[in-house]
Amino acid sequence: MQNEIQFKDENHKNMYHTLLKKCNRADEETKPVMYLLALTCNLSRAKQMFDFKEMCIRPDNFEQPWQTSSSARAIRLAFVLWNGFPTAEQHELNSVYNIFGYSSWDKYFIEAIKLRYPTTC
């Protein structure tokens, strides 16, 4: 029996389902990215960070003025879970040390990892 996904609130849950429908797939790569985008973004911001037509992350848009330290950590983790993203200059920022431990969202970060690796977690 699979555990129920933990959401921050009803808005997080609704946005997660909206984003999953928008990308038309719900696999182990997509779910954690949509989960983390839903945690931190509204639909227009999620579109800045993820190309739903091409089904790819948009790291070129990472430095948006609306980013907070928590949203930046969530999106960095989403990108890492998508494809191991870090560029050479962002490698240190994407370390476990720099993503976890600074945010009240850590429990949601763990939830995203569970979505990505359901048979391991």
For each predicted feature, which ranges?
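Extended, charge-biased low-complexity segments
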Residues: M1-T68, R76, N83-C121
